[in-house]
Amino acid sequence: IKLVDGDVFQESNLNRQLMTSKANIGEVKTEVLKRRLLEVSDAKVDTINAYIDEYFKLKNYDYVVDCIDSLNSKFELVKKAHEKNIPIISSLGTARRLSCMNIKRTTLDKTQNDPLAKAFRTLVKKNNYRKKINVVYVDTPAIKSQKLGSSIFTVGSVGLFIASEVFNDLLKEC
């Protein structure tokens, strides 16, 4: 497993990222997750404490899971995975969703009710990118409240859904 993220945990992550706690605010996300993974498994876990940009070198992996907030970084990762023929799933918006009942896997061009997906489609079109982009999103309109961010049950459910999709895709190759 290769974990890539240049971010550190902030207090705003407490409501949606299960591996964060008040004790690890300010710690590098990849290192905290690596420690947690090694507590529960014998997996080989490597980390890169960096953001994805046009200079990022994507190696050959069995699968890539994109959970990036930045649209430019998300697009760079998708392009690099496609160039290397590595399957990739991009996670889209979960902010202000109070239901995890409508999690869907589709392609970017078929998403609805998701402002992040709409912005990502705009970026993809602007760059004249024509390949299909596999995504997972919540097909439920966000509530209007600006006070509510992302909820752990929605974010967690999307994460588990993606893990299931990746696992099943890899099983098909066996």
Annotate each language-model stretch with its function.
Residues 1-174:
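Adenine nucleotide-associated cytosolic modules
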